Amino acid sequence: MTMTDPIADMLTRLRNANSAYHDTVSMPYSKLKSHIAEILQAEGYITSWTVEDAEVGKKLTLDLKFGPNRERAIAGLRRVSKPGLRVYAKSTNLPRVLGGLGVAILSTSSGLLTDKQANKKGVGGEVLAYVW
């Protein structure tokens, strides 16, 4: 069976593993998911990510980040633009997550960017997800 929204599946797996205090979470690999993982690592929400060969295709594994007392680095995740309702933002109207404390992940003509990077470049695009 095909998956209609692989990004939502990735965020759900990440949210569930984070809630259960798992150290790692695995999911089917795609280039888009690996770019999202790069952003999550650069923003400090995950420790690292790796791509492994599986029996069928490739597998993306994320190492979750926790604080000294097992506090979660990711407080919340939300899929914004969905297959049934796409959400776009102009460069002049980019979303701010929790007043700048969180990150909005955008798909732009310059690739996947955070809201801050898109603001610096002056580009808008599809708002994929919020992470805080």
Curated annotation (Swiss-Prot):
The keyword Ribonucleoprotein applies. InterPro entries: Ribosomal_uS8, Ribosomal_uS8_sf. One of its GO terms (biological process) is translation. One of its GO terms (molecular function) is structural constituent of ribosome. It holds the Pfam family Ribosomal_S8. It comes from the Bacteria. The keyword Ribosomal protein applies. Keywords: Ribonucleoprotein, Ribosomal protein, RNA-binding, rRNA-binding. One of its GO terms (cellular component) is ribonucleoprotein complex. Part of the 30S ribosomal subunit. Contacts proteins S5 and S12. One of the primary rRNA binding proteins, it binds directly to 16S rRNA central domain where it helps coordinate assembly of the platform of the 30S subunit. Belongs to the universal ribosomal protein uS8 family. PANTHER family: 40S RIBOSOMAL PROTEIN S15A. HAMAP family: Ribosomal_uS8_B. This is Small ribosomal subunit protein uS8. It comes from Kineococcus radiotolerans (strain ATCC BAA-149 / DSM 14245 / SRS30216). The gene is rpsH.
